[in-house]
């Protein structure tokens, strides 16, 4: 596949990713697509090889699909999140592991600093 066809495929992938991430927010959708169009015309890192720029655009597209979730304010202080099938949901396993910070070992400001300078 030639570089130009790979770039076109990455650009289309990016446009689809913006639709997934910002589909219900027309203003953000237009801004994201405008920024992408500008980046294709004037690459932000011209010193990178075209293949690296294409890879970067594909990574940005993947990030948009998996990690951007839009929220809409409902009544009161409640928000509705637009979580879709491609949204990456963490399993929170890192929260369950014991932290190795000063506070969790009885040191730091709240623990009185016991054994801080052993």
From Swiss-Prot:
Superkingdom, natural source: Eukaryota
Biological role: Assembly factor required for Rieske Fe-S protein RIP1 incorporation into the cytochrome b-c1 (CIII) complex. Functions as a chaperone, binding to this subunit within the mitochondrial matrix and stabilizing it prior to its translocation and insertion into the late CIII dimeric intermediate within the mitochondrial inner membrane. Modulates the mitochondrial matrix zinc pool.
Molecular function GO terms recorded: protein folding chaperone
Protein's UniProt keywords contain Transit peptide: yes
Similarity comment: family membership: Belongs to the complex I LYR family. MZM1 subfamily.
GO terms for cellular component: mitochondrial matrix
Disulfide bond residue pairs: none
InterPro entries: Complex1_LYR_LYRM7, MZM1/LYRM7
Location(s) in or outside the cell: Mitochondrion matrix
Assembly: Interacts with RIP1.
GO terms of biological process kind: mitochondrial respiratory chain complex III assembly
UniProt name for this protein: Mitochondrial zinc maintenance protein 1, mitochondrial
Taxonomic path: Eukaryota, Fungi, Dikarya, Ascomycota, Saccharomycotina
UniProt keyword terms in alphabetical order: Chaperone, Mitochondrion, Transit peptide
Entry-linked CDD domains: Complex1_LYR_LYRM7 (cd20267)
């Amino acid at each position: 596949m030639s570089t130009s066809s790979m770039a076109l495929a990455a650009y289309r992938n990016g446009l689809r990713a913006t639709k997934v991430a910002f589909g219900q927010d027309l203003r953000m959708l237009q801004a994201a697509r405008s920024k992408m169009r500008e980046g294709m015309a004037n690459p932000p890192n011209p010193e990178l090889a075209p293949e690296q720029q294409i890879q970067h655009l594909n990574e940005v597209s993947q990030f948009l699909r998996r990690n951007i979730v839009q929220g809409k304010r409902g009544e009161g202080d409640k928000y509705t999140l637009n979580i879709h099938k491609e949204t990456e949901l963490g399993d929170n396993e890192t929260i369950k592991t014991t932290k190795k910070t000063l506070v969790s070992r009885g040191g730091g400001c709240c623990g009185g600093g016991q054994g801080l300078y052993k």
